[in-house]
């Protein structure tokens, strides 16, 4: 997998486990039920210290108790975004039918870890900065040096589970989620048995929110029902969210041999870069990424049965995405269903695309989830709204970052799909 896509792949990778921590569910099954029903959980922000900020609406992960899931040793040295990732990784391994001991039975070097993150540990960092300026440097805890770092989740999953295979972190803005999955597939193709891959974000600490206020794409509307409505004439930006998802990616033949349920296969990926907030240029860049992903997957445009849209919620960006689909899919574009479940939970930056993959893999249940809160579509796309539709089999997942990264990823259904 390279930046532009480079022909049909000779080995396929399988997604055998999915772990989710999201505003609408702390488990993959509850997440899927919510997105299938088109539920919106966007709400007024309740975090202490955020009362006077202009950002009013977000997707908060509520009811998450990290102390019930993660050992104290790891809790004290990690931020909330890593707590999400650790919990999702545990759930993904369980979903894949892999205990940590079984995963490393052959060798601890047979399992790798790849994550993506956009900002790192804002909540932990804010607390320690307050100590620095309020009490003095000797009161700053030693774990500040690692907890804020965007690579922390990769390191802590690896250390906690004893996974010593290839590990890494992808930093390509919001598109990093798809790029991380592609990198994980590449690692498996090169000989690693299993890769734990994902992205989870926690951008709702006051410090983190202040850092986001410089984004002109951010919605500051106070009404959760209209704050995030991409592809409409009322589009006014996006709302942020916490959470994300972790996948277990392994070599497909190995998965079949151990009797694993294959949720999907990673068929193709490509990425481009078109510059920060240059939404007019993102049309060409996104179309090129789609072409590359289709080429690598050996997939004709008419084989794509649903598009999980990036859905920025900015008029210029939405228009560029709609036109990119026409450029890449040609005559098939008006007929392919497009969906954006994230309008019901918010954009969890790098985690958003992983949640879309989780929803795409969830189409084994036979339905395309709808796009909450969106009805008056002003672009020539077949957006799935209000209720779910019967599912087909080849999702195309799109993601763009505020700094100009574009990515596209093609999934193929697992053998047990009902699509």
Swiss-Prot record:
- Establish whether keyword Nucleotide-binding is in the entry: no
Query: Is Acyltransferase tagged as a keyword?
Result: yes
Q: Which gene codes for it?
A: curB
Name a biological process GO annotation: fatty acid biosynthetic process
The Gene Ontology terms for molecular function here are: 3-oxoacyl-[acyl-carrier-protein] synthase activity
List residues traversing the bilayer. none
Family, similarity comment: Belongs to the thiolase-like superfamily. Beta-ketoacyl-ACP synthases family.
* Limits of the Ketosynthase family 3 (KS3) domain: 10-413
Pathway the protein takes part in: Antibiotic biosynthesis; curamycin biosynthesis
Enzyme Commission number: 2.3.1.-
CDD domains, per the entry: CLF
What else the UniProt entry mentions is: This putative ketoacyl synthase lacks the active site cysteine.
According to UniProt, the name of this protein is: Putative polyketide beta-ketoacyl synthase 2
This protein's UniProt keywords: Acyltransferase, Antibiotic biosynthesis, Transferase
| Pfam families named among the record's database cross-references | ketoacyl-synt, Ketoacyl-synt_C
Q: Which residues form the signal peptide?
A: none
